Amino acid sequence: MAQEFSRTERVRHQLQREIAMILQREIKDPRVSMVTVSDVEVSRDLAYAKVFVTFFQDDPEQTKQALKVLNEASGFIRSLLGKRIKARIVPQLRFQHDASLNEGIRMGKLVAEARERDKKSSENSGDD
């Protein structure tokens, strides 16, 4: 069982690396610029992979369009993967937006705002 897990992990990391390189060097569509592969989840049988990506732009409409382009190009990306990795099965790819980065930034801003409010509140109450 542990051997299967390590193989899945190796494949997952290799897919993440190779897909990132393919997106950076091979995909020339201007709607898919500044994309980062943040994670890859692979099924136990290695037949399917969810590719989580983040984009530099914050516009939800551009993100939606870029995801559509990536999912439409998944067959092409899969064929390029087949040439780069030594695997009997190259998984079918499904691209999904990874909102965790944006959510982390939003949470960080909320914490900073709360600290600032607390600081001002304690300064004002100390003046009494």
UniProtKB/Swiss-Prot annotation:
Q: Where in the chain are disulfide-linked cysteines found?
A: none
Task: Provide the alphabetized UniProt keywords.
Answer: Cytoplasm, Ribosome biogenesis
Q: What is its main location?
A: cytoplasm
Give GO BP annotations, semicolon-separated: maturation of SSU-rRNA
Record flagged with keyword Cytoplasm = yes
GO MF annotations, alphabetized? ribosomal small subunit binding
Q: Where in the cell is it found?
A: Cytoplasm
Gene Ontology CC terms: cytosol
Organism domain of life = Bacteria
Q: Which InterPro entries match?
A: KH_dom-like_a/b, RbfA, RbfA_dom_sf
Q: Whom does it interact with, and what assembly results?
A: Monomer. Binds 30S ribosomal subunits, but not 50S ribosomal subunits or 70S ribosomes.
What role does it play? One of several proteins that assist in the late maturation steps of the functional core of the 30S ribosomal subunit. Associates with free 30S ribosomal subunits (but not with 30S subunits that are part of 70S ribosomes or polysomes). Required for efficient processing of 16S rRNA. May interact with the 5'-terminal helix region of 16S rRNA.
Its family remark reads: Belongs to the RbfA family.
What protein name applies here?
Answer: Ribosome-binding factor A
Which organism does this record belong to?
Idiomarina loihiensis (strain ATCC BAA-735 / DSM 15497 / L2-TR)
Gene symbol of the encoding locus: rbfA
